[in-house]
Amino acid sequence: MKKLIIVILLVTSILVGCTTNELTNKTDTEELVFQPYLEIQKNSSISLGIHNVPEGYMAPAKQQGKVVRFDYMTNTYDYQDRVMKKYAYVYIPYGYETSTERYDVVYTMHGHTGDVTSFPGELDDLTDIKNVIDHLIEKKEMKPMLMVFASYYHDNVDMDTDDYDASLTEAFGKELQNDLIPQFENAYHTYASSTSEEDLIASRDHRIFLGFSMGAVTTWYRMMDSMRYFRYYVPFS
């Protein structure tokens, strides 16, 4: 439970932060992808801006979003060169079905031995993370956004590797660019006008890649190979 609360604090603080700095197509010079770094002296510390989850936020909100399964086709993109069917879990904010608005997307990755349930839980037994996000959106402390909980494991099945999944996290970039993003954003209302490479690149300001533990490693790899498709990257732990 303690680990879950820590993850809730990290994820919600990150998403609220991204809401504060709204995802837009502005090109003003003061709105940079990479802000100037701060030199950190030995024994110094910086504030992460993390606060306790407000009382009541872990209980169901009045305006509840939902979590659904999204199936898509992809490839192993390795020596197997095998076509496979995979799935992700998707958080859909309250009001999405009746809205004509476009939505930002957070692509989220679990850690070593995890899966698509690591953040949201099972479809019939969701974690408190969903409730917290519902409350943040309901109280307008966070923009309504779609969240895609994906997995780098082939066939959504945990695999034994001799590199703590590093090779899988690296290879996931091709699956993400070629299959998951186009198929998901073709099915949902996002800022991509179409699933052409040109339009996916043009809408990069409206995507975040977030990962925990080996998901953070996945995030660093995406900074290396997917910068055209994502503006925001959040590796943590």
Model-based region annotation:
Residues L10-V11:
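Short, linear, compositionally biased motifs with a strong N-terminal bias
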